Amino acid sequence: MQLKYQSKQKAILLLEDGKVFEGKAAGKIGTTTGEICFNTGMTGYQEIFTDPSYFGQIVIMNNVHVGNYGVEESEIESDSIKISGMICKKFSDGFSRKRATDSLQHYFEKDNIVSISDVDTRSIVRYVRDKGAMNCIISSEITDIEELKALLAKVPSMNGLELSSKVATKTAYEIGEKTAKYKIAVLDFGVKKNILRSLTQRDCFLKVFPLKTTLKELTDFNADGYMLSNGPGDPSVMTDEILLIKQLVETGKPIFGICLGHQLLAQSQGISTYKMHAGHRGINHPVKNIITGKCEITSQNHGFTVNADDIAKNSNIEITHVNLNDHTIEGIRLKNKPVFSVQYHPEACPGPLDSRYLFDDFIANLAK
């Protein structure tokens, strides 16, 4: 199929600091707002767009071509697109791949995703890298900059924003065979499908619980262990979930946290979190495993991180992984309980396989 690039209608990208970029409309015609961020991955745009951790964010795709291989049902990480918008250099409203079932253009239109193309994405990435994360607005229907500034001024900062309730399940549900060897309670803060797949593939029966689940509801399930999922937003404001996790730690059962789950686990142990300058988003972030001394290439998507100074004051917590680019904390474990977590995504698909062993470590804790 011949690839086509939509380039008919003008679109505007306005950043919170007043910087303006002009391009062409992609996806649905309209206006959208969110926090601007960038992903340096070269593939996997459908998985990125459906990742609940991106809720409330407008993603710059550093890869030049987006949409050229279409979309396909098996490559989703949730039941709908979760990004607020997308920025790219070249947007294909046609596609060339045998397995693809639809174009990205139609996919965006169905989920009302407003985007902009034909902009210099690399210069925008450098700008955001240097200036830091900030809110932005994309519009393919409003051309007045002052009107856009007024709309953008109403958008809340990601700092202090609770977003898991927007993407987590509202009711509990089960996945896998009830005859499986292990029972896992998954606390859903915006869980990715591949986390669930990674557990069921390891002979686990899962029950996924919504936010505001009580300790009694979890203990009544009599799980062998607990999975703390990924998700969007600022972990520090999720006080109910932090208290619940603290209570789960005290049960002594195995716990594995990923991304937001990692941050909430840290908060439950008195470790603070803070907003990063620009965050980590991509599929090639180098992380050192301090236990083995090996370097792992990891997939990441987070704008908050845990405070290393607080960990240094806590004799019960051990740092297990650090980022080799900026030395931020990427993994921790408790010294006296089978509890550990990582900031990155060992389940990532597409992405490196270096850290899949963490699921096996969790299973090993269940078997003890």
Where are these regions (language model features)?
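Residues that mark the start of a beta-strand
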Residues: 181-185, 205, 254, 297, ...
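Proline-centered loop/turn at the N-terminus of a beta-strand
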Residues: 114, 183, 254-256, 272, ...
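Beta-strand-turn-beta hairpins that frame and shape the catalytic cleft
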Residues: 178-184, 292-295, 334-339
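RNA-binding accessory domains that recognize and position tRNA/RNA substrates
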Residues: 2-216, 220-221, 235, 349, ...
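Catalytic beta-strand/loop cores that center a nucleophilic Ser/Cys/Thr
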Residues: 294-337
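A glycine-centered loop/beta-turn motif at secondary-structure junctions
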Residues: 331-368
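Active-site glycine-centered loops adjacent to acidic/histidine catalytic or metal-binding residues
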Residues: 120, 259, 302, 345
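Cysteine-nucleophile active-site neighborhood
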Residues: 225, 229-297, 303-308, 351-366
